[in-house]
Every structure is written in C-alpha cells, then in structure tokens.
Curated annotation (Swiss-Prot):
The lineage of its organism: Bacteria, Bacillati, Mycoplasmatota, Mollicutes, Acholeplasmatales. The gene is rep. A motif (RCR-3) lies at residues 128-131. It comes from Onion yellows phytoplasma (strain OY-M). This is Geminivirus-like replication protein. Residues 12-141 form the CRESS-DNA virus Rep endonuclease domain. A motif (RCR-2) lies at residues 64-66. InterPro entries: CRESS_DNA_REP, P-loop_NTPase. Belongs to the geminiviridae Rep protein family. GO terms for biological process: DNA replication. A motif (RCR-1) lies at residues 19-22. There are 3 rolling circle replication (RCR) motifs. RCR-2 may be involved in metal coordination. RCR-3 is required for phosphodiester bond cleavage for initiation of RCR.
Length: 434
C-alpha cells in the first residue's frame, strides 16, 4: 500500500504545536474541528488552542484547509496516517483493499513539524492560517519560537537575536529616567526570559554571559537618573513633618558623634505615592548622603558606598532579606556587619547608619509581622522592637498630585491616623525618638 507521508512509519512523531494542511479539501471547518477534537480525546490530550482556516486558490486547485493546534503535552505517534480524514466515513473500511489509493478516499495532510522543516514561530503560523479571513478559532494561543541547532553548530543565530534584543533594551532604557541598579537587573531578567523563549537550553548555558553583557556594557552615563524634587514641592502635612524631624534628630546625633543605633524607618504605602522622591528630597535638603538600593539587596561596589551614612532600601521583599540572613543588617542596624557578596569584595555596613525601608502594599512588612504573630513565630518581635512603622496609605504626597484632594483637612486627619494591626505594631513618636 502506497503512503503519501514521507516520514517512515517507524519514525516517532512528537510535537506539542502541530500544523496540518489538507489540500483540495471539500470538508467544512466544523467537520475538521470535530475530527481533531475526537483524535486528541482518543490520545487523552487537551487542546489549548485550535484554529482552522480555508485558503481559496485562484489557480483552480481548490480549497486548502490549514489546521494549527497547541496541546497541553506532546502528541506522540509512529503512524502519521492517524491524521488522515475520510472523505466519506462509510468508505473507511475500503482502506484494507490493496488496490485502493489513500488519496481516493482520504484527505492526507502535509504535516509540520517534520525533519528538516520545524515550526520556527507559532505566531507566523497563526497569521498564515488567518490570512484569507475565513477561519474559526478557540482557546488561548501561546507564542513559541523554535530555533533548531545541530550539536556542532555554533549558536550564531541565537547570539545575533539576543544581542540585538539587548541593544534594543539598552536603547529603550536610555530614554527613561530610572535608577541604574534597577535598570541592570530589569534588563538582565528581560534578556534571560527572551532567550528562554528562543531556546531554553541556550538560555541556561548563557545566563552568565547575559549578566556580563548587562553589567559590563551598561554604564551610568547611559541612564538618566530620576531628578530629585525640591523639598518645597511636598506638602507640610503632620506625618511628613514628623519624618523630617526624626531624620533631622538622627543627623544631629551623627554630627555630634553620638554612638547610637537608629531604629529603621519602615514606610509603607501605595505604589507611585511619592515615597521615594520624598525621602530623596528630605535627605538632600538635610545634606545627608545616601545609598539607594532597589529591588535586590546589592551591597556591591557599583551600588553601595561605605562612606555614605544613610541606606534607602526600596521595594525589597522581607522574605528575600531573611533568606540571605540580612534581617539584622537591614533592620535595626546591628553593630558593624561584614556582608559577603558573591564574586565581590566583602562590604562593611556600619551600625551607625540610618536605615530607611520603602515598601509597597504587595510586600507589606506590617502584614508580614501580623501573619508571623498569628502563626506563633517570633521573628516579628525583633522587627517590632527595632523599627518605626509609618503608613502613608493610598494618598499621594507630592504637591502636583495633592491638588486632586478637595478636602485638605480630611487628608491631614487621615495621615495622623496610621494603621495599628490590633496593637501588634507600635509607632514611635517624635518625643520617644529624641
């Protein structure tokens, strides 16, 4: 019996994204859809996405039906005739006769992927099926890009793609006003994810090279730093005045060489509420040089200066701090601590440094302490005794945004009433601090 598929029967076909073309096919899209669904059900496979489109050829070659579907796991078979659709279901039994040709009674598709002809980009396939506008689709489409390399082939195409993407990211971030450390970390993560979408093994093997690319070829001159707003642009509401007074008192103690370990200011509030700009403005106004550490506890030379007396930790998860055993370094400022950074010289964190933590609602340390207390743990006690909690809630604190609140007294009253979590956390007022 003659077979129309070129792949030998003993060759294992296995694919999660499958593209079929039924040439000169008179079946409807719904009939093909039913066939594909039943076939996958027999294989106990779930269809995540399915699209069927009709292409009308003007050269009298009839209609082509293009079928593309994505599965929850690989479709495996050694017999590709399984994709043949009977022209008339009653005539299926005639396949057993030796003199019967498959093409006379079955629509036999061209199948991809196949040796030497992989599906390189699922988006391209999807667009091809849609090109004539006569299609049906259902499910959730997933973009996947494949680049097949032989064992001895150098990944020049992958390198070219990742290098170009890196340059694109670098150019994009040059247009933004953003912190240099955050920029490097974000670009590295995006570059790694992009490489994984191309070829997971390639991404895994080249992760170190990607990191070197980012940290060696992005310089501070490439990135625009956020401008620091003048202190007068912030409203003189009670909670902000109290923060200013606390920092001013701590500055006086530093100036008088008073050996005192400061409690950490933990400031929680909604994202984009102006927390970062306020503290940068206050510290600049007080002439207190500061380190700004964002997203990751990075005490490397590029991100941390031991001579600066204030450390701002912005949007760093308390669980990450604990995992690195840095809780008593970041919060409460123990005696001088030595921090070991991987592949970096050891860094000294002075016990007399002023420590400020800026936290968004999704990484609330206040909520962490409450949950820790309910579970009968004791970690919350150290944080409670070595931190001043200030909650800015959802109200913006910059002058430019403040005008949208019509009732200024209501806003001021709100800021004077921080959350307390049933007495678990206490707030140190100005008198106790001094």
């Amino acid at each position: 019996m003659k077979k129309t598929n070129n792949i030998k029967k003993e060759t294992m076909f296995q694919a999660q994204n499958i593209f079929l073309t039924y040439s000169q096919c008179d079946l409807s899209k719904e009939e093909i859809k039913t066939f594909i669904i039943n076939l996958c059900n027999e294989k106990k496979l779930q269809i995540n996405y399915l699209i069927i489109g009709i292409e009308n050829h003007q050269d009298h070659k009839g209609k082509h039906h293009h079928v593309f579907f994505q599965l929850n796991k690989q479709f495996r078979t050694r017999d590709l005739t399984i994709f043949n659709i009977p022209k008339n279901i009653k005539e299926k039994k005639l396949i057993d006769h030796e003199n019967i040709k498959i093409k006379d009674f079955f629509y036999s598709p061209h199948i991809e992927p196949r040796p030497g002809n992989p599906i390189k980009d699922t988006t391209d396939v999807r667009n091809y099926v849609k090109k004539d506008g006569d299609f049906i689709e259902e499910g959730t489409f997933k973009h996947v890009r494949y680049i097949k390399l032989s064992k001895n082939e150098k990944p020049t195409e992958l390198e070219s793609l990742t290098n170009n993407y890196f340059l694109k990211l670098r150019k994009e971030y040059q247009q933004k006003e953003i912190n240099i450390s955050k920029t490097k970390n974000e670009i590295f993560k995006k570059l790694k994810l992009y490489a994984e979408s191309l070829e997971p093994n390639y991404a895994f093997k080249n992760a170190k090279r990607f990191k070197n690319m980012v940290f060696e070829y992005i310089f501070e001159s490439d990135i625009k730093e956020l401008p620091i707003f003048d202190f007068c642009t912030f409203k003189k509401i009670p909670i902000l005045i109290s923060i200013y007074d606390i920092l001013e008192t701590q500055k006086e103690q530093l100036s008088n060489s008073i050996s005192k370990r400061f409690k950490t200011l933990i400031v929680e509030g909604n994202s984009k509420s102006g927390k970062t700009q306020f503290f940068k403005s206050v510290l600049t106004n007080l002439e207190l040089p500061f380190n700004y550490i964002k997203d990751d506890v990075d005490f490397s030379d590029e991100n941390y200066d031991e001579d600066k007396c204030v450390n701002i930790y912005d949007d760093i998860d308390i669980y990450d701090i604990q995992a690195r055993n840095l809780t008593k370094v970041v919060i409460g400022n123990q005696k001088d601590s030595i921090v070991n950074m991987k592949y970096k010289p050891r860094t000294k964190i002075k016990g007399t440094d002023i420590s400020i933590m800026l936290v968004n609602e999704d990484t609330s340390i206040e909520k962490y302490c409450f949950d820790n207390f309910k579970r009968g743990r004791k970690e919350y006690k150290y944080i409670r005794e070595n931190a001043i909690f200030i909650n800015l809630d959802k109200h913006t604190i910059t002058h430019y945004e403040y005008q949208k609140y019509e009732n200024e007294q209501a806003v001021i009253q709100h800021f004077e009433m921080p959350k307390n979590w049933d007495g678990l956390l206490y707030f140190l007022d100005q008198e106790n601090e001094s």
